[in-house]
């Protein structure tokens, strides 16, 4: 051990690719927190990722019982225990890496007792993560993914910002395919503070995400649309077209098997024979059915997540 510590600086002579490969093995091991801890103990971490050592002794107070460095190791370990992939583990390890550089003491906080603030640490941390991963020669795709997760990890910490429209925006930023990965990083952050995995708030976030991601219940789901009605069936644009589409929607909501071109083309011909008054009645009934279906789907999601 003493020899390793004494000659730790020699790791600078090892290629970045080799160091990355060995570091990745540690991160993907069952006990990555122990592995990273050993790198620090042997004096190697400061030559590989010195940015992590900036968190040693960097107190956070408030909800946190660990310093930044310890918190990151606990978050990483949770990702490993869950069997989550490399990107999640690296994002867990780096998610608060920008805190030491953004820490400020604000004496006006906590009722005048004062507290540390870390405003913008997610922005600084995302930039740091990219530099670290570029230095270690990680693939660009991996680096970009980790940086995106680090940059957005605070979204689910701000309870005041959690609205359906806000969830839609964050989904747009990270991508539908990555939103659940971001939630995994959020869970790592929470468990890294010695808190339970799935409190009510986290379950509520899951329900809101599913609500945002589910397919909309609208005429856009029909096998025919306004373009088909005009271009192929010769219908003129106007209120009647809208009423017909909503009338078709009501039937499809009752029986999804009817959502085929063959069936709907026939129904369009039949509906065209109706008066404006009858079509309007069909359209209003369809809107009511649509709203009821949406309400039931939202209730189902809330029941599923216990919120």
Question: What is each PLM-predicted segment?
Answer:
Residues 129, 167, 226:
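Generic structural marker for isolated residues within well-ordered, non-membrane alpha-helices
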Residues 1-90, 97-120, 124-139, 213, ...:
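Glycine- and charge-enriched loop/helix tracts that form the active or gating conduit
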Residues 44-45, 154, 235:
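Core structural elements
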Residues 54, 58-67, 73-77, 138-198, ...:
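Histidine/acidic-rich helix-loop-helix segments that form or flank divalent-metal centers
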